Structure formats: C-alpha cells, structure tokens
Amino acid sequence: NRDLVNYSHDNTRTSVGARLAMYEVGLKTYSPIGQSLEKRAEKIHELEEKEPRLSGALPFVDSHLHNDLIDTLSTRGIPGVALTILAFSAIFIYALRTAKEPYILILLFSLLVVGLSDVILFSKPVPTAVFVTIILLCAYFKVQSDQ
C-alpha cells in the first residue's frame, strides 16, 4: 500500500513503483516493428530526462520490463506480441478442444499470471522448457486417449 502512495507522489523507486514505471516506459517507447535492447534503453533514458518520475525503471533498462507482453512489445514490436498471443491461443484452443485435460490449462494460466508481473519468456531456456513440457503433456494425453 505504501508503494502505491509513493507512486501516486511520483516516487517510482519502490518495488511496485518501479514495476509500474517499467510498464509505462515500455508502452511509451515501443517501436511498432521492434527494436534492439540498446535502442530501447536509449529511448527510456531520453524519456526519463523528460519525465524524471519514471526513474524507477532505469535500473532495469538493460534487462527486461517485468511484464511479458510489454517487454515483447518494446523489443519485438506488434508482430512479436501478435505471435506471442497466437502461440498462447493455439495452446489454449488445443487444451480445450483436443486434450480436454486441465494440466495444460493450469500450466498456461500460470504462465499468463506470472507473466503479468515478471518476464518468463525472456531467456531462451525457460520458454524452451515450457514448450517441451507442453508437447510432452500433449503426447502423453494423446497416448492415454488412444488406449
């Protein structure tokens, strides 16, 4: 609660304030076709000079913005967000229509919830492990349904 009060007084150097500042700078500095981390960092520094209240985001400009979709939008642009949504939608539809098993939905829901406040898809090993797990679950349920 204190973090939100600080944020409302333009102090983003708190845990919640920094996250909200990261979300804001990500949305304000994205490029529709994507951009490098260096270009994004440059834009964030320029934005912070104009809006010093966003300084809580500065320690994170070289890594990620603590939200999967905003981080994807800020570096991979609209096509990256569209592909991310398409991938999650395909898994969701498969889980509902074909597998009819809750485990895939639970995994997908967990990824979406955690992705709202942190970045899961940022490093290559994590999404690889997640998608391999989903593929293995799908194969397992297919074998079970064939028996």
State where each predicted segment sits:
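Long extracytoplasmic/lumenal interhelical loops at the membrane interface
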Residues: 8-76
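Short, function-defining helix-loop hinge/capping sites that tune catalysis or transport
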Residues: 27, 42, 74, 83-85, ...
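Short Asp/Glu-rich motifs
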Residues: 45, 49, 92, 133
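Membrane-interface micro-motifs in multi-pass membrane enzymes
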Residues: 65-68, 73-80, 121-130
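Hydrophobic transmembrane alpha-helices and their immediate junctions
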Residues: 75-111
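Transmembrane alpha-helices of multi-pass inner-membrane enzymes
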Residues: 104-116, 120-147
